[in-house]
Amino acid sequence: LKGGQVMAESMGVNTFRSKMAVFIIASVFASISGWLYAHNQTFINPTPFSLQMGIDYLFMALLGGVGSVWGAILGSGIFTMMRQWLQDYLPIIFGSQGQYETIVFGLLIVALMQKAPTGLWPMLMKIMPKNLKPKDRHIQITDTTEKLAVHAMPSKGEVVLAAKEVTKKFGGLVANNKMSLQVHAGEILALIGPNGAGKSTMFNQLSGVDTPTSGEVIFKGEKINGQLSRLIASKGLSRTFQHVKILPEMSVLENVAIGAHLRGSKGVFASLLHLDRAEENVLLNEAKYQLERVGLGDYLYSEAGSLALGQQRILEIARALCSDPCLLLLDEPAAGLRLKEKQA
C-alpha cells in the first residue's frame, strides 16, 4: 500500500480493509510480545511503554529501514550503541549534564529523511558486492490449466461508457466544462488536447478517482458517479496513469499481478495459513502471460523501479490487462516510448 494507494484502489484493492488487517495483525504480535515480556520479567514497569520509548522504537525502524527484518535489527543495534556513546561523551564535550542526545537524534532524523528515506539497509544493499548480498527468492511459477474468472464482454457496437455534460471545478477553475463522449465496444476513442486541458482530470472522473461537480458518467448502463474506483474496477474498467504509478522496490511480476487482484477470492486468513498458494500461482501465471504479451517477459524478476520510463508505461498496460477489463483507459500511454516500442 505504501506509495501506491490510488493505483491499488484503481486495481480493485480495498485499501482501508487492508490497512485495518495489517493494524490488527501488528496489534496481535504487539500484545503477544507484551504478554511474554510481563511473564518473563514478572514485573511491569511503565518506562518501556512510555512516549519517549515509542519515539525511540520508531527511530530504530526509520534508521534501519522498515522494509526488511535485517533493517530493523541494524537500526536497533546502531541506535542502542549511539545512545550509549552519546550519553557518555556529550556531557564531557559540553561540560554539563543534559538531554543532548535528543538534539543529536533529532538532527539525524532530519538528515535521514533527506538522504536515506528508506533507511540504511537498502543503501547497504546497493553498495554491497553481489556475492555478499542475500539471494533473491523468486516466486516459483508452475504451469497450470486452471483459468481465472473473466468479465462478460459487451456486444460489438454497444455503448460501454458514456459521459454526459461532465463538469469539474476546482474552486474558480473549471477543469472540464460540460464534456460528453461515448465509447462503444470494439472502438478506440482518443481524447486529444494540449497540456493542462483537463484530459487526466476527465480520466479520473471516468474511473472513480475523482467525482464530477455535475453531469453523469454511465458505465455498462449503470450510473457510477461517486462510486469508489475499486468498485468501478470490479465492473470491468481498468486504467493507466499520466504519471506512472508502480511499486518500484517490488518485482515487475508482482506489480503486474496487482491487476489480477479482483480475479482472486482468497482473503487474509487464507494467506496467513498458506491456503492461497494454488490461486496465487494462477494469478502469477496470468501476470506472466500479460508481460510476455507486451514484450517484458525477460524482466519478470527485475525491480520495477529499474526499468526505463517507457518500459514502466508498458508495465502499467500489462497490469491493466491483467484485470480482464471491458474498457481500458490509457492516459498518455506512448509518453516516453521510443518509435519501435510504440509500433510494438
Mark where each language-model region is.
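Hydrophobic alpha-helical membrane-spanning segments
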Residues: A111-L120, L124
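Glycine/proline-centered hinge or cleavage motifs at structural transition points of membrane proteins
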Residues: A8, G12-V13, G71
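Glycine-rich phosphate-binding loops of nucleotide-dependent enzymes
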Residues: K156-A344
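Juxtamembrane/interface helices at transmembrane-helix boundaries
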Residues: L1-M7
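Hydrophobic/aromatic residues within transmembrane alpha-helices
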Residues: M7-A8, I78, L120
